[in-house]
């Protein structure tokens, strides 16, 4: 549903946070590592709920999660919690089933704490001219290599001109996202992000240029970089 000119879209946010982040090599799941006095997950939630169009955040956590309910954000009436699944798409579907009614759904990584409000505003603007949705992304700048399958030997250099790094948030019409995720999961498709489910069903989401400092904390070295970027963000925005 396209938002009419001058009309604010109704949006709910989903944060899949059921993963354990094994590549971080930490005792805590990565979303519970901290920047300042808040976890990565709290920073991600805060950045979304700052925007007046986003009325609710649904967090999908593991059934074994023993950390979320200790966080102050767990008491926020705008935050709902659902038990997630073993893969991202299952967690997103679980959140969609319990979320309040809304025309649009925004999905954001729980370990991506450095979202700028300018990026979020640019993404939400697309609801005025698309019935599908889109995602924040950055053009690939480095030279890209493809390896032989199962090998660390270069097979080819990949043309980077039309390649983009997919980021989050990703924003889609709610009913369309549900339909595409259900079909992709039922047919055994590989769904690495929400956009890939829509692509599988023949839709073409929009790429919305975003900032390169909107990083996802995946490896140990990412946390120090995220802390630096967040310190810069705190100097320019009210966080």
Swiss-Prot record:
Signal sequence residues: none
InterPro entries: IspD, IspD/TarI, IspD/TarI_cytidylyltransf_bact, ISPD_synthase_CS, Nucleotide-diphossugar_trans
Gene Ontology molecular function, alphabetical: 2-C-methyl-D-erythritol 4-phosphate cytidylyltransferase activity
Annotated pathway: Isoprenoid biosynthesis; isopentenyl diphosphate biosynthesis via DXP pathway; isopentenyl diphosphate from 1-deoxy-D-xylulose 5-phosphate: step 2/6
Protein EC: 2.7.7.60
Catalytically driven reaction(s): 2-C-methyl-D-erythritol 4-phosphate + CTP + H(+) = 4-CDP-2-C-methyl-D-erythritol + diphosphate
Record-linked Gene3D superfamilies: Spore Coat Polysaccharide Biosynthesis Protein SpsA, Chain A
Residues under site feature: Positions MEP for the nucleophilic attack: 160, 216
Catalytic class of the enzyme: transferase
Keywords, ordered alphabetically: Isoprene biosynthesis, Nucleotidyltransferase, Transferase
Pfam families, per the entry: IspD
Biological role: Catalyzes the formation of 4-diphosphocytidyl-2-C-methyl-D-erythritol from CTP and 2-C-methyl-D-erythritol 4-phosphate (MEP).
Subunit structure comment from the entry: Homodimer.
Family: Belongs to the IspD/TarI cytidylyltransferase family. IspD subfamily.
Protein name: 2-C-methyl-D-erythritol 4-phosphate cytidylyltransferase
């Amino acid at each position: 549903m396209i938002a009419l000119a001058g009309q604010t879209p109704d949006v709910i946010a989903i944060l899949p946070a059921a993963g354990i982040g094994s590549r971080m090599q930490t005792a805590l799941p990565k979303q519970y590592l901290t920047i300042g006095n808040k976890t990565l997950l709290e920073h991600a939630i805060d950045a979304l709920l700052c925007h007046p169009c986003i009325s609710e955040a649904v967090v999908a956590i593991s059934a074994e999660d023993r950390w979320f309910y200790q966080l102050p954000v767990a008491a926020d009436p705008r935050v709902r919690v659902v038990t997630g699944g073993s893969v991202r798409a299952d967690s997103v579907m679980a959140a969609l089933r319990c979320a309040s009614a809304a025309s649009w759904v925004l999905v954001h990584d729980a370990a991506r704490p450095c979202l700028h409000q300018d990026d979020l505003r640019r993404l939400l603007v697309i609801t005025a001219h698309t019935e599908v949705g889109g995602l924040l992304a950055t053009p690939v700048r480095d030279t890209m290599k493809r390896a032989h399958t199962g090998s660390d030997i270069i097979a080819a250099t990949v043309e980077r001109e039309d390649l983009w790094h997919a980021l989050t948030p990703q924003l889609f019409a709610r009913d369309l996202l549900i339909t595409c995720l259900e079909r992709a999961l039922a047919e055994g498709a590989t769904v690495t992000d929400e956009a890939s489910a829509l692509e599988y069903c023949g839709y073409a989401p929009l790429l919305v240029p975003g900032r390169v400092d909107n990083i996802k904390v995946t490896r140990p070295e990412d946390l120090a970089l995220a802390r630096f970027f967040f310190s810069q963000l705190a100097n320019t925005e009210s966080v």
